[in-house]
Amino acid sequence: MTDPVDQIPDHELLDEPRLVVEPGVAARVSSVVAPVLQGMGYRLVRIKVSGEYGCTVQIMAERPDGSMQIEDCEAISKALSPVLDVADPIDKAYRLEISSPGIDRPLVRRSDFERHAGHLVKVEMAVAHQGRKRFRGILQGVKDNAIRLHRDDVQNVDESEVLLVMEDIADARLVLTDELIAESMRRGKIAEREMKRDLGILPPPPPHAKNDPARSPARRNAPKPKLKSTAKAHEKKPPKNTKEHRLAAERLRRGEIDPIEGE
């Protein structure tokens, strides 16, 4: 099945705003790193500032297609470190971590909800919906400014389908399932293959996949060219070492025949 988000140009996905933004220190970090990431061709997913190891700044990013390789993390880290040193959004020492969104990733943009329709999600609302703030169910897609969710925690069919306004969502993320793991692996292989292709380091195709003109159907079914006769060029000379020649040579040695006769 074709991913509808794959049809959107990368520049539009890079410009797509996030639905959930961070407060406080994380917001200051976001204002510094988001333009740099966009200029490099990446999208900011989330920024988390924690007290781990004194202070840790975790920056979660991705390519427009949702993929992320270790080489991407290394490139982003090298680009952001000097920028953050100059901007100095944090007034103390900190540890910088660059990571991918992961399999059970947060959903922070409209395209995230569109891309992961059909998967199990957990949603926490900033504004209560029908007296509830937490929902869990199968994401059915997006309708206007809301996400469609089929809840799996209710027995009443009439209450299973809900529409949650995206602007009122505080946090939404995928739930780890076998189906999600399989989908993530498939996307990862495709992204890795495309990256290698862009870098020109794709391995050679297997022997049976090579385009061998001699084995192609067109070559096998083509009429064979007519061959010119080469009988004259390959005409054999009469042998000179037959039994008759050997007997004549012996008679010549004994003087029984004239040399001219023995030729």
From Swiss-Prot:
| UniProt main location, coarse | cytoplasm
Compartment list = Cytoplasm
Indicate, by first and last residue, each region the UniProt record lists as having compositional bias (Basic and acidic residues).
232-257
Protein task: Required for maturation of 30S ribosomal subunits.
Task: Fetch the Gene3D superfamilies from UniProt.
Answer: Ribosome maturation factor RimP, C-terminal domain (2.30.30.180), RimP-like superfamily, N-terminal (3.30.300.70)
Q: What protein name applies here? A: Ribosome maturation factor RimP
Belongs to which family?
Belongs to the RimP family.
Composition skew (Basic residues), residue ranges: 217-231
Superkingdom field = Bacteria
PANTHER family, from UniProt?
A: RIBOSOME MATURATION FACTOR RIMP
Q: Which UniProt keywords apply?
A: Cytoplasm, Ribosome biogenesis
What organism is listed for this UniProt entry?
A: Nitrobacter hamburgensis (strain DSM 10229 / NCIMB 13809 / X14)
The segments labelled Disordered in the record are 192-263
User: What InterPro entries has UniProt attached to this entry?
Assistant: Ribosome_maturation_RimP (IPR003728), RimP_C (IPR028998), RimP_C_sf (IPR036847), RimP_N (IPR028989), RimP_N_sf (IPR035956)
Give the UniProt entry's GO cellular component terms.
Answer: cytosol
One Pfam family per UniProt: DUF150_C
Q: Which GO terms describe its biological process?
A: ribosomal small subunit assembly; translation
